[in-house]
UniProtKB/Swiss-Prot annotation:
Entry binding sites for (6S)-5,6,7,8-tetrahydrofolate: S110, L111, L112, P113
Pfam families, per database record: Formyl_trans_C (PF02911), Formyl_trans_N (PF00551)
Catalytic reaction(s) noted: L-methionyl-tRNA(fMet) + (6R)-10-formyltetrahydrofolate = N-formyl-L-methionyl-tRNA(fMet) + (6S)-5,6,7,8-tetrahydrofolate + H(+)
Name of the molecule in the record: Methionyl-tRNA formyltransferase
Function according to Swiss-Prot or TrEMBL: Attaches a formyl group to the free amino group of methionyl-tRNA(fMet). The formyl group appears to play a dual role in the initiator identity of N-formylmethionyl-tRNA by promoting its recognition by IF2 and preventing the misappropriation of this tRNA by the elongation apparatus.
Protein's organism: Streptococcus pyogenes serotype M1
Length: 311
């Protein structure tokens, strides 16, 4: 049985971890995940999906704010793991830790060398890519730059958003890891170096990324909305207040960027730099998420054709 240390945080990671837990060839000695966070207005403490799964299976849990130089680092190095598996962990691994095991493998949600970094799925959708994928790669000190063990891809559908694509890629990543790891560990599967000249990056999403630019084409704004749903959610401004936009559809219409070009009891169409978008699901400041019909019956009833949002 191969003894593993698993490191990851979101549901993507938990899906990969569950695959390893269900496979009798592997023993998970411990998991390392991000600390619990206070979320929402009530500041409720939220544990990571990886921690929740580890609790259910009675696995030792380590949650350092920063792994490098921590007491937890000393403890996990003493576990005697043969190797490390990471998936969307969110921290760099110290060289001393990488050197302490026989192998260290990362499950990365992009077709490397494209989209190294922390938000590959967001960028794949926002950039209008036709496919996304997962790469199983060796870990080195440089971010997502290690040799590639295996790759698998899937089409990005017009109906996909970050949430749906995360779910698809998590399953692909789990299966790809379980399929390729035995041959990799036996030496039968030889890793392939990345073409570093082709590397692109997907840095973590900043608040500035969330703001919609209505001067872009309707397809670009549509992709941006999908690439922010369900988190962190794209927004615009209405009378100085933030208006989150979860879903929209491509529409016809011409006007100034951000201008209301159609308003009925059931629809609100906003002009973009080229074409227009029909808003479907929104969330005004201080209100719950709602359909555009509910919005137009409430806060949005004051909007008129010719008004401009986003200022």
């Amino acid at each position: 049985m191969i003894k593993l240390l698993f490191m990851g945080t979101p549901q993507f990671s938990a899906t990969v971890l569950k695959g390893l837990l269900d496979n009798p060839a592997y023993e998970i000695l411990g998991v390392v995940t991000q600390p619990d966070r206070a979320v929402g207005r009530k500041k409720d403490i939220k544990v990571t999906p990886v921690k929740q799964l580890a609790l259910e299976h009675g696995i030792s849990i380590y949650q350092p704010e920063k792994l490098s130089g921590s007491q937890e680092l000393i403890e996990i190095m003493g576990l005697g793991a043969d190797g490390i598996i990471t998936a969307a962990f969110g921290q760099f691994l110290p060289t001393i830790l990488l050197d302490s095991v026989s192998f260290a493998i990362n499950v990365h949600a992009s077709l490397l060398p494209k989209y190294r970094g922390g938000a590959p799925i967001h960028y794949a959708i926002m950039n209008g890519d036709k496919e996304a994928g997962v790469t199983i790669m060796e870990m080195i000190k440089e971010m997502d730059a290690g040799d590639m063990v295996a790759k698998a891809s899937t089409p990005i559908l017009e109906t996909d958003n970050v949430g749906t694509l995360f779910e698809k890629l998590a399953i692909i990543g789990r299966d790809l890891l379980l399929d390729s790891l035995p041959a990799y560990l036996s030496g039968e599967l030889k890793p392939i170096p990345q073409d570093h000249s082709q590397a692109t990056f997907s840095p973590n999403i900043s608040p500035e990324h969330e703001k919609l630019d209505w001067t872009m084409s309707n397809q670009e704004v549509f992709n941006h909305i999908r690439g922010m749903n369900p988190w962190p959610v794209a927004h615009t401004f209405l009378e100085g207040q933030r208006l989150k936009i979860y879903e929209a559809q491509l529409a016809e219409g011409e006007g100034l960027p951000g201008q209301v070009v159609v308003k009925t009891k059931k629809s609100l169409v906003i002009a973009t730099g080229q074409g227009a978008l029909s808003l479907i699901v929104v969330q005004p400041a201080g209100k719950p998420k709602m359909s555009i019909i509910d919005f137009l019956n409430g806060i949005g009833r004051k909007l008129e054709v010719g008004d401009i949002i986003g200022r």
